[in-house]
């Protein structure tokens, strides 16, 4: 079985959000309907609430004897939310603390899962022996299960869930579907389109280019240089595939060119002046109106919220959907999309010490991975959410597709348990994708008309084909699965924290500066004072360790 995929937050927007205060522990209590066992869960990411009488959740409850009340992050950072829990000593039954996961482990709040992994075959079969080994902590035990890192059977992928430069379909159509390969070409097209078409059909002014910078999502500003140099998403660094050495994208020639370009575009009025103060919700709201012509972001960060809103508002008819274009600094090939995804060992679903029936909790995780229940989670109910043709292939009608993007319908009907372990790839039937967005025919048939026009013009059928596919970079990949768990307990972690704080404070000033060269020099002086060699050194040590570990399993 092949696997992986951290779509990291690939399904952030399909999830539900209630107040963090709702995370009290009720594990083991019987529900009022049918005597189902009830657990609670907290995931340190934002989302949207589902209804208490959700229809598919009820079906899953009938099949498993369990229901889980999921709560999500609101009004705090992940680290703040986790810190509050640790201070109080009370936890939900299930948790994914995201950037706060290591805090939970260090606080002794998590239960070792080794015995349960061996007991329940669906869980055990998620990963290879090497991948399970990567999850062992310094005490030798496994405490969490990555949710998005399993590709079951043959890989089926149509979307690019990672980072890219995105541009609206209407811009490409207006220009006659040109080849966009460089950063200069990208911004030149946005400038020309906005000059010729400064407003939407209703007179609302376009926003040519916006940047999301809030909290951890400031990757939309700071890490573009690695992609512009054509590298895959190692997150905290670049890795030379030949020498296996860590490279610092923050100080590269491309970093200078990129931020200088942003500075020029800001001073031309192309970059949204609210970029550095807007919240994530405000950013999604802007995208949802169709006003934003382009941005850099990861698919999972906007597609399931803004994308659905664009469809529901009929803005696809104006060409407001987003298309990825393979922009690099000088037109070189990119390695953005990789076959096999990425294994994220830094966090995952954990069970806490507050859970009074760990075995039942883990049995539920195992049950959620039964194929029929997995189909309920991601395809829905046959005859209501999807149909089956004479060859056994799943598909949706136009009405079913419309319902699937409707917020109210999702709240009342859909229950993906989206931060529990799941499959990408191929169903046990050998025919269907485990999720609709991997089903090639259904994916293409369900595209908005403006996206279809773009794909037809470029001779492609998927977002992936717009960018190209590459083999997995190497056994070290991805390095962000290490740096995500940096703490200030090590020199490298302390340097990483200082650099993050510096970027938040100084990179907006660089972009807005009247004198770019002076602002960049000041930023570099401050950057070097953070001792980046410490975090780069720890990254190199981890990279070497991963290569050595992988060699033992070959």
What are these regions (language model features)?
Residues 1-6:
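Positively charged n-region of N-terminal signal peptides that target proteins for export
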Residues 8, 23-185, 197, 223, ...:
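Conserved N-terminal structural module of periplasmic/extracytoplasmic solute-binding proteins
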Residues 18-22:
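C-terminal motif of bacterial Sec signal peptides marking the signal peptidase cleavage site
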Residues 103-116, 141, 198, 305-335:
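Ligand-binding "clamshell"
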Residues 108-136, 190-194, 204-239, 244, ...:
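Carboxylate/His-rich catalytic cores and anion/metal-binding grooves
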Residues 141, 146-219, 240-286, 291, ...:
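Helix-loop-helix "hinge/cap" segment bordering the ligand-binding cleft or interdomain interface
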Residues 319, 324-326, 337-408, 412-415:
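Polar, glycine-rich mid-to-C-terminal structural blocks
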Residues 374-505:
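Conserved small-residue motifs centered on glycine
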């Amino acid at each position: 079985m092949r696997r992986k995929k951290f779509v990291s937050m690939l399904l952030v927007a399909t999830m539900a959000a209630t107040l963090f205060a709702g995370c009290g522990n009720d594990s083991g209590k019987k529900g009022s309907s049918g005597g189902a066992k009830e657990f609670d869960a907290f995931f340190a990411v934002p989302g949207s609430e589902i209804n208490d009488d959700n229809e598919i959740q009820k079906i899953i409850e009938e099949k498993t004897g369990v229901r889980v009340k999921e709560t999500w992050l609101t009004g705090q950072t992940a680290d703040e939310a986790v810190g509050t829990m640790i201070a109080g000593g009370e936890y939900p039954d299930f948790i994914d603390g995201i950037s706060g996961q290591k805090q939970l482990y260090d606080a002794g709040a998590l239960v070792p899962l080794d015995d349960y992994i061996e007991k329940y075959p669906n869980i055990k079969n998620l990963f290879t022996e090497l991948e399970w080994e990567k999850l062992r902590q310094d005490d030798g035990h496994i405490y969490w299960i990555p949710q998005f890192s399993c590709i079951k059977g043959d890989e089926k992928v149509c979307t690019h869930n990672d980072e890219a430069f995105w541009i609206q379909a209407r811009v490409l159509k207006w220009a006659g579907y040109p080849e966009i390969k460089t950063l200069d070409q990208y911004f030149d097209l946005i400038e020309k389109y906005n000059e010729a078409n400064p407003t939407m059909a209703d007179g609302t002014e376009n926003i040519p280019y916006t940047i999301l910078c809030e909290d951890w999502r400031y990757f939309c500003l700071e890490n573009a240089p690695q992609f512009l140099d054509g590298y895959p998403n190692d997150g905290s660094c670049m890795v030379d595939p030949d020498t296996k050495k860590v490279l610092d994208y923050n100080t590269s020639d491309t970093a200078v060119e990129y931020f200088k370009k942003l500075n020029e575009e800001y001073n031309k009025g192309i970059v949204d002046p609210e970029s550095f103060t807007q919240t994530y919700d405000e950013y999604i709201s802007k995208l949802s109106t169709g006003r934003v012509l382009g941005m850099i972001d990861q698919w999972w960060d906007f597609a399931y919220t803004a994308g659905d809103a664009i469809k529901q508002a009929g803005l696809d008819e104006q060409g407001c959907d987003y298309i990825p274009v393979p922009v690099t600094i000088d037109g070189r090939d990119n390695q953005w999309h990789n076959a096999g995804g990425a294994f994220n060992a830094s966090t995952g679903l954990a069970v806490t010490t507050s859970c009074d029936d760990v075995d039942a909790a883990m049995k539920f995780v195992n049950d959620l991975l039964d194929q029929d229940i997995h189909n309920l989670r991601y395809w829905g109910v046959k005859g209501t959410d999807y149909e089956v043709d004479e060859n056994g292939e799943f598909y949706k009608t136009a009405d079913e597709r419309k319902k699937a993007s409707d917020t109210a319908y999702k709240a009342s009907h859909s229950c993906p348990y989206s931060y529990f372990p799941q499959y990408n790839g191929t169903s046990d039937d050998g025919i269907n994708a485990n999720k609709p967005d991997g089903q090639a025919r259904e994916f293409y048939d369900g595209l908005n008309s403006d996206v279809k026009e773009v794909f037809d013009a470029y001779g492609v059928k998927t977002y992936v084909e717009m960018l190209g596919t590459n083999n997995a970079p190497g056994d070290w990949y991805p390095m962000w699965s290490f740096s995500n768990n940096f703490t200030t307990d090590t020199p490298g972690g302390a340097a990483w924290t200082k650099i993050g704080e510096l970027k938040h404070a100084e990179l907006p000033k660089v972009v807005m500066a009247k004198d770019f060269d002076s602002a960049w020099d000041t930023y570099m002086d401050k950057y070097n004072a953070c001792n980046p060699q410490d975090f780069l050194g720890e990254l190199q040590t981890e990279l070497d360790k991963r290569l050595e570990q992988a060699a033992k399993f070959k």
